[in-house]
Amino acid sequence: MKINHVAIAVENVEDAAKTYQDALDIKNVEFETVESEGVKVAILHLENANIELLEPTNDSSPIRKFL
């Protein structure tokens, strides 16, 4: 079995990305906003998987319920 990614809901994607970058020595991070889903995303690229940090951008975002 292989894990492609793990998604984590966060209050602030920039702060959380910095924390994970520092803790895990991650160099490759990309950010995007998906307006249709109401979410800001940081994708932290690891050697064999990715960590996706998800920040809701509005109260109707499906990510909001996980915080």
What are the functions of these language-model segments?
Residues 36-40:
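Short acidic/glycine-enriched loop/turn segments that link adjacent beta-strands
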Residues 33, 43-45:
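Short secondary-structure boundary/capping segments within folded domains
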Residues 1-4, 8-28, 45-67:
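Glyoxalase I/VOC metalloenzyme domain signal
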Residues 27-35:
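Conserved catalytic-core motifs of GNAT/GCN5-like acyltransferases
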